[in-house]
């Protein structure tokens, strides 16, 4: 914005200098011939004056046509892309009215002088008429380039957003100035309508993946909210009770609740965010989702600082609706971003509005189990970490609702199969128990330890190993939280090791021995597999088979005594199988 302003100022300075030089040249040329203006023009002088006026009339007509074509094409097309409000803004702009009105008036004056000079042939006024027409034409010529740049800059999306924002603030000021209830309703309706125009510009930008304009729109909504909160304490009660049901498009019950809580403007802004979030999730613009979540948190903090319980309650309702959108669209990334900002909101109002923090913790628990029922149980892990962080902040600040927050956190698993041993749930309980034990909150740490004894020992050993192995404080990918959730600060590591010894019976030396034995077992298995693949096929260990003999002759067969059998036939003996030790080993 600063660079753009500097560029505009530089262009204006250069253009003003050029106009001043041109004016000086005109004065320099006219001064020696100033006495000719009072003398009548005859013959060629009259024709020259008439030709000059005709040329000026032709040029002004072309210039006016060009400006009308520019405005008639550019303004509606841009309004179709962003918002119809642009046409109203363009018509209401004073500079647009001044420039277009000047071109129309200059055309009329020049055309009138051209016609009158041709009809009357006035010799005395010919030169002054021509001079006036030339002056009007020169001013029009010099204003074309600056006005063209002004129109193009008028159509920039950031400019549109800024103008609509000023319209909203002006409507809020009118709401405070008016005393008539009917006029107050009209001012409130204008403010809500302009807020919806801001939301429409942001929505179109998100659909077109225009993140810059979307960020400008969200920033404008936040600034409008801040301006309204600054003026709200000075508004009359009748203005705060004004109704705007048709503009918001809400049901009668919710509209009555909004009027009772005096949160019409707040709900109008939150309703626009509620329309923007599903679109941002669908087009996969994660930055916009994060900005919407952060903006909602900022709105909630501002109303909580003012003690506006009604508006703060509406913020929590819309936060819950956002979480529902993330679950319906099955967007884990959006759910993570929203839960993170929701937890930060509850953490920031722990001291000023502890009841609100407790409600937020309940809602986080509720939507975590909704995720489990919808087939996304892994989302419960991140909720467990956030509830643990909220409990840690509550015990650190010693707020009176800290025990209820801890009870909500402990009851998060509900002893349900598949949730009791969720890795994130177990890790969050271990880390929080270690931190509370280190800070001297033994009763809360004991409750968590008794809860952890329900977890199978194998799961506990693996979980403790993962926590102790997390040495890096920050996560190795781009994430909103930035911090590694499993990382434990060095001040709490001793408490983690002590807790592991109590729960699993394994101390540091035992863990090292177990790790060494596990590594040795794996190496032995690997060596066995490798040896089996490379070893030659062993020779069977049975008795050496007899050498093959020549078959007996006919005479030898006749002389051979008959075997002792009932039929006198010789039984053919079947070869016996080799002993098991002589069988080759099966290939692994």
Which residue stretches match the model-derived regions?
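Cytosolic juxtamembrane amphipathic/interface segments immediately preceding
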Residues: 1-6, 46-50
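Alpha-helical transmembrane segments and their helix-start/interface "positive-inside/aromatic belt" motifs
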Residues: 2-19
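Catalytic and GAP-homology cores of small GTPase regulators
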Residues: 8-13, 123, 149-156
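Transmembrane alpha-helix detector for multi-pass membrane proteins
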Residues: 20-35, 45-119, 140-151
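Hydrophobic alpha-helical transmembrane segments and immediately flanking/interface helices
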Residues: 89, 121-142, 200-224
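Alpha-helical membrane-embedded segments
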Residues: 127-156, 166-174
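Soluble C-terminal extramembrane regulatory/interaction domains of multi-pass membrane proteins
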Residues: 152-526
